[in-house]
């Protein structure tokens, strides 16, 4: 019985892996007519109501900060909210980007250190939140769909105050995309 479960589990994993590999589009299929590209450190692609973030290849393995704030509403002005925080961008395969929240009791910042290999083996990290790669840009940057994380999700930032009503997702919208020297910011209007 256990052997049958293992075989079924392996078949499911192989099927999921093959589906994930087929889901990555070519850049020409991805970049449709009417799509705009906003250049920056992390280029952003906008097509109608869909937002895609490009993770350049040189940022795989690096850390970024994901945070948010309420600018106004509910008697809150410029109030920080719970954000994803500092995450490491990893790519376990060509079809996935993960935001890993590293947990270290100690760190080695020099990647050429003689202790780096033993340190990485003794500090295995959880995979983190994974995002399917939609397409790769001509510069080999991985494009991930981030629309729902900005508009309705609470993965990247959340606010759990009792006086904030429930979200009305169909009225929420992206107001502005602002690339700057170190990253990109989004102004999102969420209706509650």
Language-model features and meaning:
Residues 1, 20-23:
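Basic/polar N-terminal segments that are highly enriched at the extreme N-terminus
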Residues 7-8, 34:
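Homeobox/homeodomain signature
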